[in-house]
Curated annotation (Swiss-Prot):
Regulatory subunit of the histone acetylase B (HAT-B) complex. The complex acetylates 'Lys-12' of histone H4 which is required for telomeric silencing. PROSITE patterns: WD_REPEATS_1 (PS00678), WD_REPEATS_2 (PS50082), WD_REPEATS_REGION (PS50294). It is found in: Cytoplasm; Nucleus. WD repeats lie at residues 131-171, 184-224, 234-274, 281-321, 325-365, 382-422. The keyword Repeat applies. The gene is HAT2. Keywords: Chromatin regulator, Cytoplasm, Nucleus, Repeat, WD repeat. SMART domains: WD40 (SM00320). This is Histone acetyltransferase type B subunit 2. It comes from the Eukaryota. Belongs to the WD repeat RBAP46/RBAP48/MSI1 family. It comes from Gibberella zeae (strain ATCC MYA-4620 / CBS 123657 / FGSC 9075 / NRRL 31084 / PH-1). One of its GO terms (cellular component) is nucleus. The record marks L298 as: Important for interaction with HAT1. Pfam families: CAF1C_H4-bd (PF12265), WD40 (PF00400).
């Protein structure tokens, strides 16, 4: 009789797990329905994209009530379908006077999150496709010339495309015509960053545990193949992300599965040891880093341990602060382009969180504590699967594009009533003291 009892117990456990899975799916679907009502724009892509970035330019067609922004996207298709590097035009309505008809009783405001009388005018169209070998792990434009695009491939190569030398729609010959191939990595990677201080230079990180630097200006006239100008072997495990310091032109940061944040000084010839090494800040792999563009010493790190670390580079023996609010690995980070203390993070928990570091340490009422720490400003829960990437729009404050493994590209904006500053907010330059 004992085996039968054991079988019954196993069936009960399976039923409980099935019920939990069903409840989880129902919760995800309900959240999605809510956000679908409130998001300015949701579009189902034919294939998911692992990468998204707003271009820096914006056009204002004469006589139109919208502006045209552009997005850089990729594809992640099945093996049978070709992959593309893609550019999309996004029509965003111009700011219009508040319409009393848009008053929302529940929020007590006109319009609000993603609400506008011109929402229907938002439109997203793919305007150029460039054939790509396999999925696009990451794509980024060169800041000095946004027509020059770099992509990370599944075989470890980095491809450089000049989009002006490619048709808007390829003939699907299966032939990839990149202008330059950067060869050196021995495995795929997701770390890619252009040098904001010097045109034609970029850094990359890979599963081969190396960080490599490249200088397109050294390419020989009769060649399409470029080798790295320098290879760093200061990490012991996968290098997940790399970034040039936006202020100090000689520093490059990298993070790794070895749970360290490391900063190299390119003025030094040493390639096996970093100038700055931050250890013991996380309990699992570090997936991303982001230097604060308004503070020379502040940097954030995102980890698989579900937390975000805030560091002062003058003393990396311990973190300045830890941001806690995600329920799964944190995979992406980006500071707001104009608000000095605002940090965005994306996670496998399907959420994007905006953090306001000026509110660190603020006192909370007991009821408010249930909503998270005081610095948790806003949480976007509209995706139904893991977040792949997100990007702040540099021209429209608080406008964000986000992409997830659910094939959805979302373009959304937070209501001003949510992100308004308080008089008692801490200045960003006081956080790093």
């Amino acid at each position: 009789m004992a085996p039968a009892a054991s079988a019954d117990h196993d069936m009960d456990v399976d039923m409980i797990h099935d019920e939990e899975d069903d409840q989880g799916e129902r919760l995800i679907n309900e959240e999605y329905k809510t956000w679908k009502k409130n998001s300015p724009f949701l579009t189902a892509l034919t294939w998911p994209t692992l990468t998204v970035q707003w271009f820096p330019d914006v056009k204002e067609p004469e006589g139109k009530n919208y502006k045209i922004h552009r997005l850089l996207l990729g594809t992640h298709t099945s093996d049978e379908s070709p992959n593309y590097l893609q550019i999309a035009d996004v029509q965003i309505p111009k700011v219009v006077a508040p319409n009393p008809d848009d008053y929302d009783e529940e929020r007590g405001e006109i319009g609000g999150y993603g609400k506008s009388g011109d929402v229907a005018a938002i439109k997203c169209d793919i305007v150029q496709r460039i054939e790509h070998p396999g999925e696009v792990n990451k794509a980024r434009y060169q800041p000095q010339n946004p027509d020059i695009l770099a992509t990370l491939c599944v075989d470890g190569k980095i491809l450089i495309f000049d989009r002006t030398k490619h048709p808007l729609d390829p003939t699907s010959t299966g032939k990839v015509n990149a202008q330059i191939e950067l060869v050196g990595h021995e495995a795929e990677g997701f770390g890619l960053n252009w040098n904001p201080h010097e045109e034609g230079c970029l850094a990359s990180g890979s599963e081969d545990t190396t960080m490599r630097l490249w200088d397109l200006k050294t390419l020989k006239a009769d060649s399409r193949i470029l080798n790295p100008s320098r290879t760093y072997r200061h990490h012991t495990q996968i290098v997940n992300d790399v970034q040039y310091h936006p202020i100090s032109k000689n520093f490059i940061g990298s993070v790794s599965d070895d749970q360290t944040l490391q900063i190299v000084d390119i003025r030094h010839s040493e390639t096996n040891k970093a100038a700055v090494v931050a250890k013991r800040g996380h309990l699992d792999a570090i997936n991303a880093l982001a230097f604060n563009p308004n503070s020379e010493v502040l940097v954030a790190t995102a980890s698989a341990d579900k937390t975000i670390g805030i560091w002062d580079l003058r003393n990396v023996k311990e973190k300045v602060h830890t941001l806690e609010g995600h329920n799964d690995a944190v995979t992406s980070l980006a500071w707001h382009p104009t608000e000095a203390g605002i940090l965005g993070s994306a996670s496998y928990d399907r959420r994007i969180i905006f953090w306001d570091l000026s509110r660190v340490g603020e006192e909370q009422l007991p009821d408010d504590q249930d909503d998270g720490p005081p610095e948790l400003l806003f949480m976007h829960g509209g995706h139904t699967n893991h977040l792949a990437d997100f990007s702040w729009n540099p021209n429209e404050p608080w406008l964000v594009a986000s992409a997830a493994e659910d094939n959805l590209l979302q373009i959304w904006k937070v209501a001003e009533s949510i992100v308004g500053k308080d008089d008692g907010d801490l200045p960003i330059d006081e956080l790093d003291r």
